[in-house]
Regions:
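Short, solvent-exposed loop/turn and secondary-structure capping segments
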Residues: 64-68, 166-170, 194, 201-204, ...
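Conserved SGNH/GDSL esterase-like catalytic core that processes O-acyl groups on lipids
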Residues: 25, 46-170
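Loop/turn elements at helix/coil->beta-strand transitions in domains of secreted/extracellular proteins
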Residues: 49-52, 149-155, 183-190, 220-223
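Active-site-proximal beta-strand/loop segments in catalytic clefts of secreted hydrolases
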Residues: 56-60, 156-161, 192-197, 226-231
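Catalytic His-Asp segment of secreted/periplasmic serine-dependent ester chemistry enzymes
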Residues: 197-293
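Boundary at the C-terminal end of the N-terminal hydrophobic targeting segment
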Residues: 11-16
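Bacterial N-terminal signal peptides
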Residues: 1-9
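Active-site segments of SGNH/GDSL-like serine hydrolases
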Residues: 160-163, 178-211
Length: 293
C-alpha cells in the first residue's frame, strides 16, 4: 500500500492502529516517487552526491551503535544478502570526518557522526544556528550538515526528547521545518517513527507523536521508516530497548549491532541498522539516486 493511497486518514485524532500498521520500509507509490524525483533533480543542480547520506537526530542517531561499524566492518547479513550492493554503494564515497570514535580508518556516511546528530536534541535544536565549524556560522545545524556532505538522502529521527517538552502538534511543526530544509537542499528526507517507551506517561505520547510523524510523511509525500514497528514486533525482547527503557539494546558480548541473523535481530540497534539499510536500498532501487535501477 503506497503511503498516499491511505487518503487523509491521519488527523490530530488519529488512532494508534493507523500508523502502527504501516510497513517498516515505505512502499513508494507514484506520487511519492514523482515528488522524490523532483527533489533529486534539485540535488543534481546543487552537486549532491548519490552515494552519500546524512544522519540527523538525537542520541539514538548519534550513538556509535547506529551504523558506525558498517563504515569499516563487514556485517553478518544472514538472510539479507541482497543488501550488499546498497551497503557497498553508500560506503564507497569518502566524506569529511565527524565526531565519531576513531574506529574506522576511513570516513564515510556510515561512520560519520556530524553536526546534526547530537544527544539530547529535539527537532527544534537542529534548526538553531551553529557557532562552528567556521564555514557554517549562522546556518542551522541541519543546513550545515547538508552543506558539508551534499548527501542524496537524510535519515531523520526526532521525538524521543521532544515528547518531554512539546505537544505532538508543536513537534510536527518543527519536524516539518527540518524536512523542508532537507528537501530544499535537494536531499531526500526520510522521517522515522520513534521507538516504544513503555514507561508511563510516555507510551501514549509516543503513539501521538508517531501519528503526527506519519501524517507529515503522508501530507508531504515523504518516505516513512516505521522503526517503531520493528521494535514492537513479536519476539523482540523488551521491545528492543536497553535497561534505561529509552535507547535501543545492543547484543553483548560481542557488543555488535551489525549481526543481522535471527539472534542478532533480537536487539534494538541491530534492528535499527538493518532498517536503515533496507530503507536506503528501497530508495536506491526505486528513485534514481545512483546505479540502483
Amino acid at each position: 500500500m503506497a503511503l498516499l493511497a491511505l487518503g487523509s486518514v491521519f488527523s490530530h485524532e488519529a488512532s494508534a492502529a493507523e500508523w502502527e500498521e504501516l510497513p517498516v520500509v515505505p512502499v513508494l507509490g507514484p506520487v511519492v516517487v514523482g515528488h522524490l524525483e523532483k527533489v533529486v533533480d534539485r540535488g543534481e543542480r546543487f552537486g549532491n552526491r548519490p552515494g552519500v547520506f546524512a544522519k540527523i537526530g538525537d542520541s539514538i542517531t548519534a550513538s556509535p551503535s547506529f551504523l558506525q561499524a558498517l563504515g569499516c566492518q563487514s556485517p553478518r547479513l544472514g538472510a539479507w544478502s541482497e543488501l550488499r550492493g546498497t551497503l557497498e554503494f553508500f560506503g564507497a564515497a569518502a566524506v569529511p570526518r565527524g565526531s565519531e570514535e576513531a574506529r574506522c580508518s576511513v570516513s564515510n556516511s556510515y561512520s560519520r557522526v556530524g553536526v546534526a546528530a547530537v544527544p539530547g536534541w529535539r527537532a527544534v535544536d537542529a534548526l538553531a544556528p551553529l557557532e562552528s565549524p567556521p564555514e557554517c556560522q549562522g546556518l542551522p545545524a541541519v543546513s550545515c550538515e547538508l552543506q558539508l556532505l551534499h548527501p542524496s538522502v537524510a535519515l531523520i529521527m526526532f521525538g524521543t526528547n521532544d515528547l518531554e517538552d512539546f505537544s505532538a502538534v508543536e513537534f510536527r511543526r518543527d519536524l516539518a521545518r527540518v524536512s523542508r530544509l532537507v528537501s530544499s537542499a535537494g536531499t531526500i528526507p526520510v522521517v522515522s517513527t520513534i521507538p516504544p517507551r513503555p514507561r508511563q506517561p510516555f507510551s501514549q505520547r509516543v503513539a501521538r507523536f508517531n501519528a503526527e510523524i506519519a501524517a507529515l510523511a503522508e501530507n508531504r509525500a515523504l518516505p516513512l521508516w516505521n522503526f517503531w514497528r520493528q521494535m514492537a514486533a513479536p519476539g523482540v525482547p523488551d521491545q528492543g530497548l536497553g535497561e534505561d527503557g529509552v535507547h535501543p539494546s545492543v547484543l553483548c558480548p560481542p557488543c555488535t549491532a551489525i549481526d543481522f541473523r535471527p539472534a542478532g535481530l533480537r536487539q534494538g540497534y541491530a534492528l535499527r541498522n538493518l532498517g536503515a539499510l533496507r530503507v536506503l536500498d528501497r530508495l536506491r532501487r526505486e528513485v534514481p539516486i545512483g546505479d540502483g535501477r
